[in-house]
Curated annotation (Swiss-Prot):
Signal peptide: none annotated. Pathway: Protein modification; protein ubiquitination. A zinc finger (RING-type) spans 1716-1763. It holds the Pfam family UBC_like. Widely expressed, including in the brain and spinal cord. Residues 572-581 have a biased composition (Polar residues). Residues 550-583 are annotated as: Disordered. Its EC number is 2.3.2.27. This is E3 ubiquitin-protein ligase listerin. It comes from Mus musculus (Mouse). Component of the ribosome quality control complex (RQC), composed of at least the E3 ubiquitin ligase LTN1 and NEMF associated with the 60S ribosomal subunit. The complex probably also contains TCF25 as well as VCP/p97 and its ubiquitin-binding cofactors.
Amino acid sequence: MGGKNKQRTKGNLRPSNSGRAAELLAKEQGTVPGFIGFGTSHSDLGYVPAVQGAEDIDSLVDSDFRMVLRKLSKKDVTTKLKAMQEFGIMCTERDTEAVKGVLPYWPRIFCKISLDHDRRVREATQQAFEKLILKVKKHLAPYLKSVMGYWLMAQCDTYPPAALAAKDAFEAAFPPSKQPEAIAFCKEEITTVLQDHLLKETPDTLSDPQTVPEEEREAKFHRVVTCSLLALKRLLCFLPNNELDSLEEKFKSLLSQNKFWKYGKHSVPQVRSAYFELVSALCQHVPQVMKEEAAKVSPSVLLSIDDSDPVVCPALWEAVLYTLTTIEDCWFHVNAKKSVFPKLMAMIREGGRGLAAVMYPYLLPFISKLPQSITEPKLDFFKNFLTSLVTGLSTERTKSSSSECSAVISAFFECLRFIMQQNLGEEEMVQMLINEQLIPFIDTVLKDSGLHHGPMFDHLADTLSSWEAKADAERDPGAVYNLENVLLSFWGRLSEICTEKIRQPEADVKSVLCVSSLVGVLQRPRSSLKLHRKKTAQVRFAINIPEAHKGDEKSMSSEGENSEGSDGGAQSPLSNTSSDLVSPLRKKPLEDLVCKLAEVSISFVNERKSEQHLQFLSTLLDSFSSVQVFNILLSDKQKNVVKAKPLEITKLAEKNPAVKFLYHKLIGWLNDSQKEDGGFLVDILYSALRCCDSGVERKEVLDDLTKEDLKWSSLLQVIEKACSSSDKHALVTPWLKGSILGEKLVALADCLCDKDLEATTSESHSSEQWSLLRLALSQHVKNDYLIGEVYVGRIIVKLHETLSKTKDLSEAANSDSSVSFVCDVVHSFFSSAGGGLLMPPSEDLLLTLFQLCAQSKERTHLPDFLICKLKNTLLSGVNLLVHQTASTYEQSTFLRLSVLWLKDQVQSSALDNTSLQVLLSAAGDLLGTLVESEDTSLLGVYIGSVMPSDSEWEKMRQALPVQWLHRPLLEGRLSLNYECFKTDFKEQDTKTLPNHLCTSSLLSKMILVAQKKKLVLEDNVLEKIIAELLYSLQWCEELDNAPSFLSGFCGILQKMNITYSNLSVLSETSSLLQLLFDRSRKNGTLWSLIIAKLILSRSISSDEVKPYYKRKESFFPLTEGSLHTIQSLCPFLSKEEKKEFSAQCIPAFLGWTKEDLCSINGAFGHLAIFNSCLQTRSIDDKQLLHGILKIITSWRKQHEDIFLFSCNLSEASPEVLGLNIEIMRFLSLFLKHCAYPLPLADSEWDFIMCSMLAWLETTSENQALYSVPLVQLFACVSFDLACDLCAFFDSITPDIVDNLPVNLISEWKEFFSKGIHSLLLPLLVNAIGENKDLSETSFQNAMLKPMCETLTYISKDQLLSHKLPARLVASQKTNLPEHLQTLLNTLTPLLLFRARPVQIAAYHMLCKLMPELPQHDQDNLRSYGDEEEEPALSPPAALMSLLSSQEELLENVLGCVPVGQIVTVKPLSEDFCYVLGYLLTWKLILTFFKAASSQLRALYSMYLRKTKSLNKLLYHLFRLMPENPTYGETAIEVSSKDPKTFFTEEVQLSIRETATLPYHIPHLACSVYHMTLKDLPAMVRLWWNSSEKRVFNIVDRFTSKYVSNVLSFQEISSVQTSTQLFNGMTVKARATTREVMATYTIEDIVIELIIQLPSNYPLGSITVESGKRIGVAVQQWRNWMLQLSTYLTHQNGSIMEGLALWKNNVDKRFEGVEDCMICFSVIHGFNYSLPKKACRTCKKKFHSACLYKWFTSSNKSTCPLCRETFF
């Protein structure tokens, strides 16, 4: 119903809310008794039957049913529909007794609602009725008469679903046998209801005119009338004859009413259609009644014969036929010649007005029922009738529809045959039919290309066959004579029109081919039985006639049977005979016609070279290939013997005119033909070959023609015709298999391949020659080659040679060469080969194809389109190979040789990424095809054959560069004590992939493809392949600064899904892990790292790992493999297992000799294991670690020379280096985990710190050896130890100090820390001076991270006491002392260094210096006095010079990006370093700015304004800051009131932490923006106000959303927590309202000011409001408020600083200093100076800056007050 106040869909009325009303009525039984009155007036008793009283109703009907029945009386469609559906459900669900209670009220409801306007309601009503019937069954009987009339109407509903539902309900109520009885039982009531609807009802009586629109009333009335007419027809069909008699009076009464007959002229087509259907039924079932009303029936039906409505037409014509049959004197009541026939002829002339398919099948029965009296003169009548039919065929509507055209043609021939049958002896009629109708009709169809010829030819052939059959079967000589005369006349006239068509010089091809088609159909007529059945099925007046009226049926159709029966009887024997047999009556005239047409055609060909006549001749000969016809085609001159030919051919030509014609005429035509569509000439050739007596003769002729006479194009067409027709193939099979054709094709292949390789341009007909080869190689039927097998092999060999030579040609040459044609030929050969065995040359060809597909374009020089062709050709060949029944790996040459070639490619050849990708793709395609092989072992054997042996794998692994070790060594995951590699990987940086990578990826690709077949490989081949791929992937992953082609290699594997996750599903993890453990225990190194990666990626627990090594003792004595295995397992072992491993090592630390200390099974190896366990914090026994420290200390005493203190490392052995590295690692880990709370003795601290400093000195003294990996590792570990010591002492707390030795802290600060940084700072400068362009990931710069991290702990004093060489720039303007300027000039350039650790270390060191620098400018501040017009002072020159260089770099990186579009900078890229350095430089400048005094800040800000550096920064920041600067982990926490953002959290500039690198630049950009807004608010405000609108909005929106609240809170907090005291002024702050209140008091004067921060602070203006004002004049008050507002808006500082400036200004005012009369302020708002420049005339003083502005803006040099010249 919709909402109570919603817009209604119709009527715009509010809903009736019928559901609620019905419920109320159901409840209030006392108020409304029963059903009386609801929905009607009190005079209408509603639904109450007369037999019951109102007081009994409530007890009989269920309350739910009452509510539903009330709903059904409502007008709303939706209410009724839902109520009816609910009623149906209740009928199904409720018990029978409850449903039976509804029956007394159902008839009236049903009768009303079954006529409802809405079709959905009507459908639902019938569906609900069916459910009611199924429930109550026979109890419906008492109420049947009340509903049957409407029920019958419902079955004729114009809405098919409603009608179907009513029929379903009727069938549910009565079985088919009982339905007539049920109808008969209610016939009187039905007739009464239907007659009332037809005669009494009007639109206004059926519907309420006041509530129902006129259109709806009319529609309902028309539907009711239609249903009533159809229901009457249904009643007539249902009732048996004996029941119909009792209704005759009823029908007479109906037919006597003029209103009934008016329905025949009704404006609604459905009503007329139903009317005519009822008339047909009345004629059929009550013919006597209709005869009595003949005067009304005949005009009503016959005068409507031109009704062209498609709805009415079928019913009308059925009524016409029934009227003619039932009412014999119907023509007495109409004027046929003036009224009926003119309308009929008009319809026919117009082609049935689009209804020919419906109307024309009735024409034959119609004319068969016409009495002779009304057709006189019959010659004119039938002539007019047939002429009208032919005219109708020419209408555009008929020609555009094949069904319409076919119907007209069919009707024409049916009527023609009938008229001929009825008037066979009448010469004049016969001549009219043949000469004036049939022949002109044929001529019309032949002339008009828009008509469909097929139906006409079929009907003509069928007509001739029927006449011939009748002539053969007829016993009356007169009848036979008449029929023969008809046929003779027909053939004579047909010959004339056909010859006339052919004789036209400009006859078009369609016209002449139409003639040949007609002759062909007459030669081989199609089955006429099908047409006959089709015709009889369309005579509808004989259908569905009950048994009682068989006599009527016979009388109605007897004439039709007589007219057509003889046809059918004569045709049946013809239809059973072969279609190729022609009647003798037809054979002679047809042959004469063919010969005559051939003669005419050949004359046109000879004289005018007419191509259309040649095509006609071809089609003619195809149907009539006889010697007589060929004899006609030869002129007298051409009947002599063929000369210059072999004797056999000459003899054959003498005997056979067809062969003679072939040589004299056809060969010349074939060779002269320039058109591609010359196939009709080849058809003539086949027609001539059919005339040869044997296959030998045909072979001789074709062999002779092949040698010299036939062109390649003609030869191609001959073979194509043979392949397209089995009959033609049978004619030429001996020739196709013969040697003449085979040798010629082999020679053709030689010619084509050699010619195209030598000269890339091909002749115009070469594509035809290639097509000929392709056709010859393709197989035909029964797996047999089209030509001889030996010739196929020879051609394949030649094609193979051609493909092999492609590598020697350029890409351009290959594009135009024969390779493309070869691919087409070979592809066709493979595709058509079926299941036949491949010959050896084919397998060699397959191998070459595979090699071309598996190599990159750089090697093959083939364009892309050729590669695609080659691939398709290869796959078709391999597909053929694997489906051979007897194909195995050993038998296949291709499979064996392809394996060898693949192994050679990946193990011996130099492959780059592109080559490998192509190879993998080709191998995958090949394996994908092999998967489909029926031989299950083939795939496994193939992969096993490609698999290298163990020794080959080992050789490839050893060939891999070992630079991968660098990262595991630095990270402490592996330990080595021998020299492993010498140089950076860059020296070996080529594009060639190592063979191991190629081999492992190839085999991985193979097993991925093979998984479709669930392959089981023997001897752990699958696990070995996966292990080798993991080895390759781990090698790539461990490489630092790997060449770009290796990342490309990994990308290729990802793209091809060659990943461990995809391969792991193919093998059990346990077997793979066991294999890896075995290899790790044996070899260590990369295999150990693979185990760690596998355990991590597969989330394998320590309990699952344990079975693989069983006993821990098995790892000892230590080898390199067992050491590396334990180191890799440590992160995944349980704490207890690590303790057990540690326990195995403890005894080994005691009693070592000097040599044993450095060996793997000595101190070095065991200490390495201990370090690995300690690194995972699994050893918490502090005493144990303290004991090991003491042992190491004892080594220092016993074997001092193994400690590399202050020595030359070039003399140290790798074993000693390795031991020192492990000792340093232990000391670092000891400091991190155990130094506190474990108290150490002074000697132990001395040992640690002195050793650290000595190792650092060694590192510093051996810079030349940093390229040696172990030396570099030694340096890194020594820096780590120094860094850990610095971190330890930096984070020390008072609690820890109490447990440390007394002088330890002072010793650290005074000696050790100073010693560390005095060594590292020069070392850093020297290291980066030699390698300016190396990134932090390179080998040489690996030590930068620990070195730089250590330098971040350097103190300011240590920096200032540096010993760096002087570095000064002559042009630099500076107030700094030389040693400080040197430090700046040395450290500042490091902000642009390529390595991030250096940039961050330089920032940290410079950041400690920045607060010291402004003081040096402060001391020289007087030199920047008031004399300058706009004084400006540069921040440190070194920083500004660097900033200038950085701005140029940033312009290149970000300049082209619009402001507001976020740029993502790739971590550690070159651009990353540029942006990082730029942002760090600005952080330093802002730190410097914040440390300066107010006066200095004014000078610095003026400098920044002049250089516009700040503007550039702000533009760049809005390209770098993220749209949502929220931390990732807090972005999800929506409930958090204050989520963490990049503005609330300080950026951590960590050197070692790399996990946050993607957020490094965005966070840093936000930090710089925050500092800029905080420290330079006035300058940012100025930039914002001057920016364009788009940028203005972006900045305002972003700042208001993310920054303003943070800054406002910080500003208010700084006021609240400020310790600054003002004499005479108090300051308070309110955080909630963002207000600051300042109260200034001096003597009796009180001034209170309220400062309000804007929502977009600091971009918006700060408002100053007045509070208390005591003792101050209004004007002065306003001036002071304006001054404060100006200070807060234009000064770059905090609110407290602005208030301090304002207070000083007021104080000076009270001290007697006058305001400057230009700015009306005592203290200048920008440079904080007092008014000093006095006018000599008026003695007023002004600020120097204000005067300068006055002079420049006014262009005068006068005093602003007295206007006298200012001196």
